[in-house]
Structures are given as C-alpha cells and as structure tokens.
C-alpha cells in the first residue's frame, strides 16, 4: 500500500520543473499522477521545489490546519507552485483543469518518523 508520504509526493511534488510549462500542465499532470482515475479530483497543488526543501517545512512555522488539527507547518519562504482547479466543463472521465502558476507560502501537515509532509493543506 502506498504510504502517506509517498502519496504526498505523487499528488503534490514536481521538482523536475520550475513552473508549469503550459496551460495543459494540469490536465497532463492530474492524469499522469492518477488523480483522475475514479473521479476528477476537484483541486490539487503541485510544488516546484526540491523534496528536501518541502520536507524542511515540517520544522518551520507551526500553524493550525484548516480542519483545526495542530500538525500543520507554513513555509518561511515562498515556493513556486501550480494550482490545478477543475473547470466548469470538466466531466469524468474527461477531467479538465485550469492551470495557475504562483509563488506562495505552503502549509503542509506532517507526521511519522522521519517527520515528513503527508497532506497539502493550503497556500498563502
């Protein structure tokens, strides 16, 4: 079974590019990362930074998660991210996404030993 840390990497990490390469980025990434297999995942964020830099956020600014849990951390610096949001015309299995490039602080939930990101909570 895929670990929570591995799932985070599959769903949110794209260290190989510094930003979204084209407007098709989200359509392609959501499909290739299996985020449209049994439904269209409505929203997803990819982070264009090294895994080490994202894992380091687990020791940065301690903040509350959206659900009120306390295991979330906000990055001290802004990171290059791409937000993928399902469009109005998107219909499974033909999932369609709007690609939005941004530089923002990320908020992740961390757990385990080693203490690593397992959930992408928000960007601010």
Curated annotation (Swiss-Prot):
Its main location: secreted. PROSITE patterns: RNASE_PANCREATIC. Glycans are attached at residue 34. GO terms for biological process: defense response to Gram-positive bacterium. One of its GO terms (molecular function) is lyase activity. Substrate binds at residues 7, 10, 41-45, 66, 85. It is found in: Secreted. Its EC number is 4.6.1.18. The active site is at 12 (proton acceptor), 119 (proton donor). Pancreas. Disulfide bonds join 26-84, 40-95, 58-110, 65-72. This is Ribonuclease pancreatic. The gene is RNASE1.
């Amino acid at each position: 079974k895929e670990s929570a840390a591995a799932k985070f990497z599959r769903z949110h990490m794209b260290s190989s590019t510094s930003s979204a390469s084209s407007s098709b980025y989200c359509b392609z990434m959501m499909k290739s990362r299996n985020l449209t297999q049994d439904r269209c995942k409505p929203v997803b964020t990819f982070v264009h930074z090294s895994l080490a830099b994202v894992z380091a956020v687990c020791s940065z600014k301690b903040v509350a998660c959206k659900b009120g849990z306390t295991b979330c951390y906000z990055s001290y610096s802004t990171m290059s991210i791409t937000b993928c949001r399902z469009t109005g015309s998107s219909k499974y299995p033909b999932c369609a996404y709007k690609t939005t490039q941004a530089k923002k602080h990320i908020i992740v939930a961390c757990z385990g030993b080693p203490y690593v990101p397992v959930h992408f909570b928000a960007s601010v």
